[in-house]
Amino acid sequence: MKIVRAALLATCFAAPELAAAQTLQGLPPGPLGQAIQRGHDMMMNSSGSTEAKPYVGNALNCSSCHINAGDTSTPGNFRETASKFPAYSKREGAVITLEDRIANCFMRSMNGMRPSTDSSVVVDMAAYINWLDKGQPIATPPAPSNPSPYPAMLKAATPADVTAGQTVFTANCAACHGTDGAGLGSFPPLWGPKSFNAGAGLANIAKLATWVKGNMPLGNPHLTPQQAFQVALYINTRPRPDFVLSQHLAPGHDYNASVHAETDTVASNLQKAGLSLQSLTGGP
């Protein structure tokens, strides 16, 4: 059993490096195809890319959340993403483009500086996402047929859910992400200074629960909705970097938003749901 487990982990550890070297098939010839390939490669190895690294402030890659550079059918995929933009963003209070969304991810999920939307990094990633969308209809996607159970679970969350989430984490996540959530090998940190900040999309517990339910454990997602929620609650009550918008915008930035002041913390994210970090964890 230990031999099989070790072999499985070795395969998983090697997978990101193998995928990063993948040559995409069916690309258009010339500069556009080259841009698409670069966009894919930067997503697979953002923190190791010469072009993307200056905008990355943690130990994550885009593929840490967008598995296989988003070329999957699970939550976090990029299929049919380009056709959803331009779109109104409540967070920014503005109609934003795909390029805006990519640039904003760098300062939130990657905890780095926001690149300009006309930078080669953003343009190449947008080219890749658009290529994945080839042949897809340009239309507003239908609303989910079944409402998410997680907002209601969040409103009713108790310290017992945090404790249960730690148990789920230990049994299903710690082998790859470490008991301290700092990540092991090529598996990313889930909290702490090298993970996504409190302004990231996955800092939203309901969104993280949806992502976990569809993707984790890697290669064998099998958690119940309650387990996915509890482990998401546990992860998002751990320490992570605060998000202060002004600290992620370079002079002369092209941030497309009507909201120009934003600060998010682990505690403030819970307060938005009517919860107290201290009550849930006994911490400060």
Model-derived features: positions:
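Post-cleavage N-terminal segment of exported redox proteins
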Residues: 1-48, 87-162, 238, 272-284
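Sequence/structural segment immediately N-terminal to covalent heme-attachment motifs in c-type
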Residues: 31-69, 149-187, 205-206
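Extracytoplasmic electron-transfer domains, predominantly the class I c-type cytochrome c fold
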Residues: 33-38, 42-44, 71-115, 125, ...
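Secretory-pathway/luminal and periplasmic proteins that interact with or process carbohydrate-rich
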Residues: 49-52, 69-75, 132-137, 238-245
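Surface-exposed patches in mature extracellular/periplasmic domains of secreted proteins
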Residues: 49-55, 113-118, 138-142, 220-226, ...
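A structural motif
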Residues: 98-99, 133-144, 175-183, 201-208
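A cross-kingdom marker for long, charged
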Residues: 239-284
